[in-house]
């Protein structure tokens, strides 16, 4: 398809995943870890974050290690493969972090490990200290269904 577009920090991953057939144009770019960005900009808290970095989620979390347990953000993480899920497990141990598989309206459920079902790739991940906050959010939106 001439309109097929994607972006990746790893051209090899792009070529080997999902049958991408488009042209690959490479650009040099500077990258930084979240930890260094947070320190450099004197950021004192992060409540909510979305991590969707096309199979570089483990690297993103490794670069956030210093502040992850300090800020304890609620995170929406896209996990595209079981290999990526396996790499995330030691970074988000289930004795400290909760995982909710976002599998459609009224189907989301708390799970012990990332499960890739190839229909739903998004997970809500939060520190166990945020249990009460998550329950309150669920109560507030119990009757909200964006698909009606």
Where do the PLM segments sit?
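Phosphate/nucleotide-binding beta-alpha loop and adjacent structural elements of enzyme active sites
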Residues: 1-148
